[in-house]
Regions:
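Predominantly extracellular/luminal cell-surface or secreted proteins
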Residues: 75-77, 98-102
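Bacterial N-terminal signal peptides that target proteins for export
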Residues: 1-3
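Solvent-exposed adhesion/ligand-recognition segments of exported proteins
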Residues: 107-112
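Extracellular acidic loop/turn motifs
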Residues: 67-69, 103-106
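N-terminal small/polar-rich segments of proteins
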Residues: 17-89, 114-154
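N-terminal signal peptide c-region/cleavage motif recognized by signal peptidases
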Residues: 10-14
Length: 154
């Protein structure tokens, strides 16, 4: 009887359980990014006899990764003469203009020289540009245009 009981107890007891573990490493690499949008600067209508400069504005909206350092830069446009920005009527006539980063138009942004330093917030950031066409320019009537390339370096 004892042998039968021992055999029955041995069969009824569960085998010792075993547990194994493993690790899964989880990673991601976030790379800095910037997206840019611009608005046109339109000076409207202008006569060379106006007593004050003609003024215009434009916005550059940048969305850069959080804490990403970046700079905004402007080239001289299609018709620059050295550091002087110019719009052309396509017939060899030019209207001078400048772009500044302040409403008083004293902090001029020289082509490919002056950069606007910023730090990304991960949200859209608007940088307003302030344009000025000096009065007293003696040019033929017509439509004058230019195209500026905006560069974001990050």
């Amino acid at each position: 009887i004892v042998a039968a009981t021992a055999l029955a107890v041995g069969l009824a007891s569960p085998a010792a359980a075993s547990t194994q573990t493993g690790l899964i490493e989880v990673a991601i690499t976030i790379v800095p990014t910037c997206v840019i949008q611009t608005t046109d600067m339109n000076f409207g209508t202008f006569t060379s006899s106006e007593p004050t400069d003609d003024l215009g504005t434009s916005n550059i909206t940048t969305t850069c990764s959080l804490l990403t350092s970046f700079t905004l830069g402007l080239d001289g446009g299609l018709h620059a003469d050295g550091a002087q920005r110019r719009m052309s009527d396509g017939n060899g006539n030019f209207v001078r203009y400048s772009i500044a980063r302040d409403v008083a138009r004293t902090q001029l942004l020289r082509p490919a020289v002056d950069l606007v330093p910023l730090i990304g917030t991960g949200l859209p950031q608007v940088t307003q540009l302030y344009g000025s066409v000096p009065t007293g320019q003696n040019v033929p009537a017509g439509t004058y245009t230019d195209r500026i390339t905006v560069t974001v370096d990050f």
